[in-house]
């Protein structure tokens, strides 16, 4: 872009020329070096020590979908942060939870939010939930070079589909491959434990309150077996970030609401340390 536009107070011509409704396409044309995937890295000497986000879980219910994440970030065998935010609103009817390299993941979320906002301003309408999931897939794929050097970003995307009138969940791999999940999903280092917990407890007829409890139960089980996942920290008053998306839009539970769910689970775990048990038949 021309530097002398600053002295005239006018926007560069590129900003006034009709083009794609994709902000990433615009940035790729005008300042490609600003896209995360276009940055070159020096040859790596050993493992990269960077903070990593860990476990994200999601579950759908008849009125929408919930998305939650623990608060711990790790760097090797160290705890890098105890209160990291890993779940963000993407727009009014969707949210994204991040796992993987924390700095790159947060940057990707901000770019994704801007991408959706730009589309809505240019087109005068929101992108469909399917379209949003595809845009995120493209962004993850653009980070493949960094992922191959150990700096991967693997998010979980969930939202309320206003056309189908239901909640939907999408998971991804490091190449940008997208999978729509049925009922529940998890990503991150503790995902195998969280997914197993939800597998035994999930039902299609869950109420919103039950779905909220389910994801916190799953995070508790993940923290129980995965050292990189942080459980509810009562002493520091740090609890999972829990969000719900319905036909009324995105809502993040307050700290008080999250703490009430977590504390009720902790009380029950004093009697049943391994959590609720599913029936054998």
Curated annotation (Swiss-Prot):
Record entry for activity regulation: The formation of the proteasomal ATPase ARC-20S proteasome complex, likely via the docking of the C-termini of ARC into the intersubunit pockets in the alpha-rings, may trigger opening of the gate for substrate entry. Interconversion between the open-gate and close-gate conformations leads to a dynamic regulation of the 20S proteasome proteolysis activity.
| Catalyzed reactions per annotation | Cleavage of peptide bonds with very broad specificity
InterPro entries this protein is in? Ntn_hydrolases_N (IPR029055), Pept_T1A_subB (IPR000243), Proteasome_sua/b (IPR001353), Proteasome_suB-type (IPR023333), PSB_actinobac (IPR022483)
A cellular-component GO term for this protein: proteasome core complex, beta-subunit complex
Q: Which of UniProt's keywords are assigned here?
A: Autocatalytic cleavage, Cytoplasm, Hydrolase, Protease, Proteasome, Threonine protease, Zymogen
GO MF term list: threonine-type endopeptidase activity
The record's listing under Pfam families reads: Proteasome (PF00227)
PROSITE patterns, per database record: PROTEASOME_BETA_2 (PS51476)
Q: Which domain of life is it from?
A: Bacteria
Major place of residence: cytoplasm
Q: Where in or outside the cell? A: Cytoplasm
Pathway this chain belongs to? Protein degradation; proteasomal Pup-dependent pathway
Cite the active-site annotation.
54
EC number(s) recorded for this UniProt protein: 3.4.25.1
Q: Belongs to which family?
A: Belongs to the peptidase T1B family.
Q: How does it assemble?
A: The 20S proteasome core is composed of 14 alpha and 14 beta subunits that assemble into four stacked heptameric rings, resulting in a barrel-shaped structure. The two inner rings, each composed of seven catalytic beta subunits, are sandwiched by two outer rings, each composed of seven alpha subunits. The catalytic chamber with the active sites is on the inside of the barrel. Has a gated structure, the ends of the cylinder being occluded by the N-termini of the alpha-subunits. Is capped by the proteasome-associated ATPase, ARC.
Q: Which PANTHER family match?
A: ATP-DEPENDENT PROTEASE SUBUNIT HSLV, METALLOPROTEASE TLDD
User: What is the purpose of this protein?
Assistant: Component of the proteasome core, a large protease complex with broad specificity involved in protein degradation.
Indicate what this protein is called per its UniProt record: Proteasome subunit beta
* Primary gene name: prcB
